[in-house]
Amino acid sequence: MLLFELAFAAGMREGERYALMPYELEQRDGVPGINVQQQIQQYGKPEDAVIPAWLKAEHLYGILWLTTPKTHAAHRFVPISTSLWQRLWARIKRLGIGPRDLIFTNSRGNPVRSSTERYNWNKALKAASLPPVTIHSARHWTASMTARANMPDDARTAIMGHTSITMTNHYTHRDTASLAALLDQAIPDLHDDTEIIEAEIIEETA
């Protein structure tokens, strides 16, 4: 499912994926990607909604609002694979989705809600006999995989849309193999014949 794939391949937040529109799909220097410019958030019905004044917001449906990102860092360009790019456009053309229409909606044509995605995500996990984890863990996976690939910190924060590497590191979980590989690169082999001789001398002196 493309909605799930975007969580892993692009590290996009839930609201950013729900709000994705064709006009956000761009090619820069021949690189396909997503220019993240908006998100969907729950702020309540129009008569009850309390929205920060610095956010541009448009009511979509029920308690759902289309807003600008909460931080400058969240407004970012995230490269995606050619395969994902082509499949997104295939969906757009097949369903006749306009430039400012939502790429993902529920069966009634309304914006996707987290509860709807959570239901389908859990259903997919069960079908694949996988343990229950939240879809938000996909962002942790993206942060961890970019760290494993030794991507520079500034690039990782740019992709994740974080304001600092501290937050990105909070999402990062190093696996044992990558830690071992990094340690092997940093620390040379310290074992040689001299080490054995020195140990014997120290023992005799004592």
What is each residue range found by the language model?
Residues 40-75, 82-84, 107-108, 166-169, ...:
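C-terminal secondary-structure termini that scaffold catalytic or DNA-interacting sites
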Residues 1-14, 18-20, 28-31, 65, ...:
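Basic, Lys/Arg- and aromatic-enriched nucleic-acid-binding interface segment
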Residues 3, 36, 44-47, 88-89, ...:
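Extended hydrophobic-aromatic, low-complexity segments
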Residues 1, 10, 78, 90-111, ...:
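Short, basic (Lys/Arg/His-rich) helix/loop patches that form interaction surfaces
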Residues 20-23, 141, 174:
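Structural detector for helix-capping/boundary residues
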Residues 7-50, 154-155:
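Short, charged phosphate-coordinating catalytic segments
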Residues 35, 77-79:
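Generic structural detector for well-ordered beta-strands
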Residues 31-39, 134, 145, 154-175, ...:
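Short functional hotspots where side chains directly engage DNA or cofactors
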